[in-house]
């Protein structure tokens, strides 16, 4: 019984504001009136059940409900704010209502009064026959095409909780040129409804002549917000020709209450398409262009920064204990290859080989994924793959191919000088190149015991401890250690000077014993000791540290722990 065509109706949201001749005792400087109506005085009561205005919480009875026309609220105040407006439909099915975040801005003294109008086009797709008749009675257009739905679905699909926050920033961006206010008003309008019809919201602002006001212009001295509800002197009638006033960013009493209880709208039911604002020429040049641009940049940069914090966070850099805070950001582990790919591509655009082709051995997140799998897959307790000459080659059961070739190349180079080997090994295999180019990745701590820091960070083998937790901070933590024989002078600095051959042999042996260590209380002691040095890196599944970054005192303590475990 549902009609197959879409019906479009229009709503006009607007407000008027003027400076009072004399401020009230509460300090209110403006009288304002906000309204919802049909275009050209069409009777929207046919399909509108009620309109709810959510005023700022400082007003008495901030929730104002209008069940009959005129749907308007008149008040006095001294600053603008974002005013959520909910229009409830006389519809037995969804959508039952739509919500708009309206920017009720005021103006500076000495400028023309605000006379602002914003048009909303709501397109209901396949309404019920009963609701369709109501829409048509109110002047709905039954022949409206639905081609705009795709372009505006993002607006309609935003949840109303997020819309209030986006509207506050977008409303500030709408405070200048005519082109900017259409985009701001489109993002500040959000929908609240649920299912079977799609409402396309075409949203225009026809503002009048005006003056957009400076951010700081409306900040009254801090005063109590206990406002008495004052009916303002009546404004000019609603059908008066409209003038536009430029929107004032952030002129709120405080922050409007976000109405976040709305259900998440279905973009297939109601779409709200934004149109261009129509404005009369303003009497003075807009003064808020720079504000509007900066607000847009702030909004954009905040979202970019959020993405970058996940996509290019430095989980691969061994710094100091400051890196511990990365444990809290668990989501960076879930980013997987995306994080590494974006980080690498920033450093060396498309010159890197695809990570999928190189088995991702240098990807810490992939290591972590492998480690979680191989807890069940790998029966061998010492499953540490290594890129060095020491006797761990048989344990390379997971990472093969290019990694094995690195190990062989390095095996033949073991007796050369450190500085020479660093240069030679830069070209050992394709897998090393992303690490060398990545710069910050060359200091990734991993399980390597006989290679320069670049190739060892490329191989980044893992050792899997038993499932019970080794650390207080995380449940299934895995210990990763690295004791390179050859290392780049620019990458690591050893406190007691260059490692001599004997000391490095000790480190290799220490590494081997650490990899076979199974006593949990000893492992916990080691973790506690390394934590004191600050030379470690924690991921969701591993506790990584570099033996060469530790001083000899700490190394001796590690050896003593292992001696204890050997005798026990």
UniProtKB/Swiss-Prot annotation:
The record marks 481 as: KMT2A/MLL1 fusion point (in acute myeloid leukemia patient F1). The keyword Ubl conjugation applies. It is found in: Nucleus; Chromosome. Residues 149-190, 303-313, 371-395, 445-461 have a biased composition (Low complexity). It is linked to A chromosomal aberration involving MLLT3 is associated with acute leukemias. Translocation t(9;11)(p22;q23) with KMT2A/MLL1. The result is a rogue activator protein. Fusion protein KMT2A-MLLT3 interacts with MEN1 and PSIP1. A chromosomal aberration involving MLLT3 was observed in a patient with neuromotor development delay, cerebellar ataxia and epilepsy. Translocation t(4;9)(q35;p22). Component of the super elongation complex (SEC), at least composed of EAF1, EAF2, CDK9, MLLT3/AF9, AFF (AFF1 or AFF4), the P-TEFb complex and ELL (ELL, ELL2 or ELL3). Interacts with BCOR. Interacts with CBX8. Interacts with ALKBH4. Changing residue 28 to A: Decreased binding to crotonylated histone H3. Decreased binding to acetylated histone H3. Enriched in undifferentiated hematopoietic stem cells in fetal liver, cord blood and bone marrow. Residues 138-475 are annotated as: Disordered. The gene is MLLT3. The record marks 58, 103 as: Histone H3K9cr binding. Chromatin reader component of the super elongation complex (SEC), a complex required to increase the catalytic rate of RNA polymerase II transcription by suppressing transient pausing by the polymerase at multiple sites along the DNA. Specifically recognizes and binds acylated histone H3, with a preference for histone H3 that is crotonylated. Crotonylation marks active promoters and enhancers and confers resistance to transcriptional repressors. Recognizes and binds histone H3 crotonylated at 'Lys-9' (H3K9cr), and with slightly lower affinity histone H3 crotonylated at 'Lys-18' (H3K18cr). There is a cross-link at residue 339 (Glycyl lysine isopeptide (Lys-Gly) (interchain with G-Cter in SUMO2)). GO terms for molecular function: chromatin binding; DNA binding; histone binding; histone H3K18ac reader activity; histone H3K27ac reader activity; histone H3K9ac reader activity; lysine-acetylated histone binding; modification-dependent protein binding. The modification Phosphoserine is found at residues 288, 294, 412, 419, 483. This is Protein AF-9. The YEATS domain specifically recognizes and binds acylated histones, with a marked preference for histones that are crotonylated. Also binds histone H3 acetylated at 'Lys-9' (H3K9ac), but with lower affinity. Binds crotonylated lysine through a non-canonical pi-pi-pi stacking mechanism. The YEATS domain also binds DNA.
């Amino acid at each position: 019984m549902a009609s197959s065509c879409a019906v479009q109706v229009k709503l006009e949201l607007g407000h008027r504001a003027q400076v009072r001749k004399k401020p009230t005792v509460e300090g209110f400087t403006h009288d304002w009136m906000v309204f919802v109506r049909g275009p050209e005085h069409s009777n929207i009561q046919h399909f509108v059940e009620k309109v709810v205005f959510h005023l700022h919480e400082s007003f008495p009875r901030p929730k104002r409900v209008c069940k009959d026309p005129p749907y308007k609220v008149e008040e006095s105040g001294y600053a603008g704010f974002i005013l959520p407006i909910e229009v409830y439909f006389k519809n037995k099915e969804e959508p039952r209502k739509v919500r708009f975040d309206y920017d009720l801005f005021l103006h500076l003294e000495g400028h023309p009064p605000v006379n602002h109008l914003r048009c909303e086009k709501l397109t209901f797709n396949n309404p019920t026959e009963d609701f369709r008749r109501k829409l048509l009675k109110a002047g709905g257009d039954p022949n409206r095409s639905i081609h705009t739905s795709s372009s505006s679905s993002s607006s309609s699909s935003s949840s109303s909780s997020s819309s209030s926050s986006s509207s506050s920033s977008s409303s500030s961006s709408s405070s200048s040129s005519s082109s900017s206010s259409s985009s701001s008003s489109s993002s500040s309008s959000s929908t609240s409804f649920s299912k079977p019809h799609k409402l396309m919201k075409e949203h225009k602002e026809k503002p009048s002549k005006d003056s957009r006001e400076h951010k700081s212009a409306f900040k009254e001295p801090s005063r109590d917000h206990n406002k008495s509800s004052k009916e303002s002197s009546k404004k000019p009638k609603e059908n008066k020709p409209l003038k536009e006033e430029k929107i004032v960013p952030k002129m709120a009493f405080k922050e409007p209450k976000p109405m976040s209880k709305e259900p998440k709208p279905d973009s297939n039911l109601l779409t709200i398409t934004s149109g261009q604002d129509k404005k009369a020429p303003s009497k003075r040049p807009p003064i808020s262009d720079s504000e509007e641009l900066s607000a847009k940049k702030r909004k954009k940069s905040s979202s970019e920064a959020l993405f970058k914090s996940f996509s290019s966070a430095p989980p691969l850099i061994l710094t100091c204990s400051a890196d511990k805070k990365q444990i809290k950001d668990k989501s960076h582990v879930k980013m997987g290859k995306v994080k590494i790919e974006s980080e690498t591509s920033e450093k060396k655009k498309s010159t890197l080989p695809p990570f999928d082709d190189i088995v991702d051995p240098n990807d810490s997140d992939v290591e972590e994924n492998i480690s979680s799998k191989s807890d069940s897959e790998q029966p061998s307790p010492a499953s540490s793959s290594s890129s060095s000459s020491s006797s761990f080659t048989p344990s390379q059961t997971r990472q093969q191919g290019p990694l094995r070739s690195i190990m062989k190349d390095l095996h033949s180079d073991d007796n050369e000088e450190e500085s020479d080997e660093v240069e030679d090994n830069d070209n050992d295999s394709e897998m090393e190149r992303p690490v060398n180019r990545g710069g910050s990745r060359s200091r990734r701590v991993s399980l390597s015991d006989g290679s320069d820091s670049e190739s060892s960070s490329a191989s980044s083998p893992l050792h899997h401890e038993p499932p019970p937790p080794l650390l207080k901070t995380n449940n299934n933590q895995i210990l990763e250690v690295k004791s390179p024989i050859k290392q780049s002078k620019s990458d690591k600095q050893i406190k007691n000077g260059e490692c001599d051959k004997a000391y490095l042999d000790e480190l290799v042996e220490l590494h081997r014993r650490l990899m076979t260590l199974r006593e949990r209380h000893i492992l916990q002691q080691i973790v506690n000791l390394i934590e004191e040095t600050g030379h470690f890196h924690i991921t969701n599944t591993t506790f990584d540290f570099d033996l060469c970054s530790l001083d000899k005192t700490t190394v001796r303590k590690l050896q003593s722990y292992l001696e204890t475990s050997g005798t026990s």
